[in-house]
């Protein structure tokens, strides 16, 4: 059986609120760490989210 190309990652807020999103990414085409600008409902504004491992 082949190895899966998509892996689950956690996008953690840089506003230090502890809020995170869980998403998937293709590990073969996107080898660097993912960053996205998304909405943080605890901070009530759009902030940068950085990729961390799911524990």
From Swiss-Prot:
Cellular component terms per the entry's GO annotation: cytosolic large ribosomal subunit
Gene Ontology molecular function: any one: structural constituent of ribosome
Coiled coil feature spans: none
GO biological process, one term: translation
Keywords: Ribonucleoprotein, Ribosomal protein
SUPFAM superfamilies according to UniProt: Zn-binding ribosomal proteins (SSF57829)
Similarity annotation: Belongs to the bacterial ribosomal protein bL33 family.
Name of the protein described by the UniProt record: Large ribosomal subunit protein bL33
Naturally occurring in which organism (per UniProt): Chelativorans sp. (strain BNC1)
Gene name of the encoded protein: rpmG
